Amino acid sequence: MPITPRHLRQWKQQGRPIVALTAWDFAIASILDEAGIDLVLVGDSLAMVALGHPTTLPLSLEDMIHHVQAVQRGCRNALIVSDLPFLSYQTSPEDAILAAGQLLKVTEAQAVKLEGGYPRLLETVQRLVEVGIPVMGHVGLTPQSVRQLGYRQQGQTPEAQQQILDQALALEAAGAFAIVLEHIPDRLAAMITAKLSIPTIGIGAGPNCDGQILVTADLLGLTPSQPPFAPAYLNLRQAIGSAVQRYAREVRDRQFLQSQPAEQEPLS
C-alpha cells in the first residue's frame, strides 16, 4: 500500500517508529522499497555521494528531477520526498511554488523538503501548503547553509536551542507535515518531538525522535569518511574495491573465465 504523509502522522500517534533512508537512483530505491522502508528521501546529498561535489550547493532543479524520476521507478510503496535544491525556493514564495510545482508535475514525488525556519521561509511553507504541495521541514544542521553555519552540531547554547524549538513549532503552524531534526542534542530533539503533533525524523538527533533517517551511502559504508552520527552497517566501499581488484587481477593474469566450460567450438 502506498504510504502518504497522513500515515506518518498516524504512526506518531500510535508510537510506531518511522524508517527513512535516502536514494539517488533506481537500483538503491528498489532495494529500499523491497526492504519495507517507509520514506525515501531524494536528498540533495546526492550532489556529494552520487555526483562528487564537495557540498550540496551546486545541485540544480533539473538534477533533482532527473534523480527523482529514477528513484520513482524503483518505489511502489515508500513515500517519496524530494529536497528542493539551493536557491530554488529561498528567493520568493512564488519561485518556490514554481520549482516545487514543476518537480511534482513531472515526477511521482509526493512532497518536498525545505531547510530552515526563518520568517520568509515560513511564508513560503504556508503558500506551498495552500496550493496543495505537502512540505517537510528541516531544522538544526542545514547543509544548504554550510558556508554560514558549517557542519558542526547545532543547538549548543540555551539561546540556540530555543531558536530551533521555535522554528520547529513555527513550521508546524505553517503546515509542514513532518520535520527533519539534524545533528542537534538528544535532549533538544526529545523536547521538540514531545511538543509537536507532527512527526520528527532524526539524523544525528538521538533515539527519541518519531523516526530516523540516514544517508544510504553512509549506512552502507560507501563514503570515504563517516559522519560521527551515522553508523555504517557494511563496509561496501571496501567490498566493492576488493571485488574490482580481484576481477582486474584475473583479467591481467589471463585467469578470467578460465574455469568456465567452453561454450563455442573452435573455428576451423
Swiss-Prot record:
It comes from the Bacteria. GO terms for cellular component: cytoplasm. Pfam families: Pantoate_transf. It catalyses: 3-methyl-2-oxobutanoate + (6R)-5,10-methylene-5,6,7,8-tetrahydrofolate + H2O = 2-dehydropantoate + (6S)-5,6,7,8-tetrahydrofolate. Binds 1 Mg(2+) ion per subunit. GO terms for molecular function: 3-methyl-2-oxobutanoate hydroxymethyltransferase activity; magnesium ion binding. The keyword Ribosomal protein does not apply. Transmembrane segments: none annotated. Gene3D superfamilies: Phosphoenolpyruvate-binding domains (3.20.20.60). Mg(2+) binds at residues 44, 83, 115. CDD domains: KPHMT-like. Belongs to the PanB family. Catalyzes the reversible reaction in which hydroxymethyl group from 5,10-methylenetetrahydrofolate is transferred onto alpha-ketoisovalerate to form ketopantoate. PANTHER family: 3-METHYL-2-OXOBUTANOATE HYDROXYMETHYLTRANSFERASE. This is 3-methyl-2-oxobutanoate hydroxymethyltransferase. The gene is panB.
